[in-house]
Amino acid sequence: LLDSLGGRAAVAAAIHARLLALRGALEASEFFATHEVVGSSLLFVYDEDDGGPPPSCWMIDFAKTMQVDAAAVPPPGLTHRAKWELGNHEDGYLSGLDSLIDVWGALKLQLEMESK
């Protein structure tokens, strides 16, 4: 991953910021709170040209997203972070996103340190 960034701390910083914004939006989303998201993907996009569009990340592939009946989910409801157990509809989406945020944050810091 470091090699593909070509030492560009700004790219890592932009992706990291986008992932943080995505997590914030998902945590505030009524739709996300009531849907199990299985098999979706994150599409990372950036142009190697410095004059291209800013680096970003997008959620894609929602074919297996299903609304969950609130009565079928024990309190505190669907968290997207709780461990999956048969019938709890937890998908681990936010756990995975948290891990990606940690990875991109570490990449950003490493590239910033290397550029000094």
Feature names for model-found ranges:
Residues 1-116:
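Polybasic, positively charged surfaces/segments
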